[in-house]
């Protein structure tokens, strides 16, 4: 038997039982406090993550409000009716995209991308012919100019021949008249005819020689013209034959355009209709004028809760390492300010550990 601090006699067995009860109570206190701290720490992480997401959302809403005048909060009731419209627009966009994908599919022979390669080949062939024609035209051009020049010369010579023939006709008519008059006259007239006829014959002979010379020159120039014209003709026939296929291919290009352009015109018209529908939905959520501090109060509250949650995380980590009354009081204060129901529940649980009564134990 021994006496305690109150001079009451107790046995060693009573002391041992009392010591066991104290240890069990202390273990229970430590468990409740540790559980409340861990529990609040975990859900503060989750709550902080949600706060960051919501804050990002509100910052986005604030940005669209001030930059695009879109007010989703006031017009939130319009979101649900707009969803079916957006789904319909989405289907229409998919139809346009599918059609465009078909036209850009390299595995499809009828796709526009393959037709473009075909058009590129045709254009290259036509370009090569044009280049060849340009090179040949440089060779043909002097021949054409020569034909024109020789043609002018032939025309000039023909005019000269015409004049000589006219002169020959005049001389011949004059000679015939004198002969007729002389045959009906006397001997003196015949004598004069003999004297003049030599001159007339010389004039006729000279005209005939000129005509003969000009005719030979015309014949020579005609052969040259014929030769050059034949060469020009051959070149023209060469290019005429060579251009038949490219000309058919150009018709093929026209057919491709006639077939494919309506598709893109239709899609362009459809995209314009889709855009008009989207703008109609967009206009339903816009406001004429923005208010200065419309979203600020929400942003301030969210920032306060984020800062409070960060401080609460630091306090819970520190309290799990070393629990003191000061840390627990801070835990209670910032836990209440967190507006987190689960943290409030953790605070209530921690109160069962009677932290004020057990403050001397420091909850180790």
From Swiss-Prot:
Give membrane topology per the record.
Answer: Multi-pass membrane protein
| Keyword line | Membrane, Transmembrane, Transmembrane helix
| Compartment list | Membrane
Q: Where are the transmembrane segments?
A: 41-61, 298-318, 329-349
- GO cellular component assignments: membrane
Gene3D superfamilies in the record? Methyl-accepting chemotaxis protein
Q: Which domain of life is it from?
A: Bacteria
The UniProt record lists the keyword S-adenosyl-L-methionine:
no
Primary location: membrane
In its UniProt entry, what is this protein called?
Uncharacterized protein MCAP_0005
């Amino acid at each position: 038997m021994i006496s305690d601090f109150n001079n009451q006699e107790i046995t060693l067995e009573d002391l041992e039982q009392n010591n066991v009860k104290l240890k069990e109570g202390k273990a229970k206190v430590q468990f409740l406090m540790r559980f409340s701290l861990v529990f609040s720490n975990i859900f503060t992480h989750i709550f902080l993550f949600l706060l960051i997401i919501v804050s990002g959302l509100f910052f986005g809403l604030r940005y669209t409000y001030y930059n695009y005048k879109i007010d989703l909060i006031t017009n939130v009731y319009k979101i649900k009716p707009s969803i079916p419209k957006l789904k319909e627009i989405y289907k229409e966009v998919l139809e346009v995209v599918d059609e465009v994908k078909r036209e850009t599919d390299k595995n499809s022979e009828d796709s526009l991308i393959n037709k473009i390669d075909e058009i590129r080949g045709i254009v290259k062939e036509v370009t090569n012919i044009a280049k060849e024609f340009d090179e040949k035209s440089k060779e043909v051009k002097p021949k054409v100019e020569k034909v024109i020049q020789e043609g002018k010369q032939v025309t000039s010579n023909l005019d000269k021949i015409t004049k000589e023939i006219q002169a020959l006709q005049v001389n011949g008519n004059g000679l015939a008249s004198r002969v007729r008059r002389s045959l009906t006259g006397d001997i003196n007239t015949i004598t004069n005819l003999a004297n003049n006829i030599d001159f007339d014959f010389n004039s006729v002979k000279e005209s005939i020689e000129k005509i003969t010379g000009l005719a030979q020159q015309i014949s020579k120039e005609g052969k040259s013209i014929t030769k050059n014209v034949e060469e020009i003709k051959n070149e023209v026939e060469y290019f005429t034959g060579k251009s038949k296929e490219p000309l058919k291919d150009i018709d093929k290009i026209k057919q491709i355009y006639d077939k494919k352009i309506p598709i893109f015109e239709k899609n362009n018209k459809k995209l314009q209709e889709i855009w008009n529908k989207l703008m109609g939905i967009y206009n339903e959520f816009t406001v004429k004028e923005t208010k200065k501090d419309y979203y600020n109060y929400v942003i301030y509250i969210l920032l306060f809760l984020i800062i409070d949650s960060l401080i609460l995380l630091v306090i819970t980590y520190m309290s799990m390492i070393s629990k003191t009354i000061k840390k627990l009081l801070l835990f209670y204060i910032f836990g209440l300010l967190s507006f987190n129901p689960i943290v409030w529940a953790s605070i209530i649980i921690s109160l069962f550990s009677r932290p004020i009564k057990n403050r001397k134990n420091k909850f180790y």
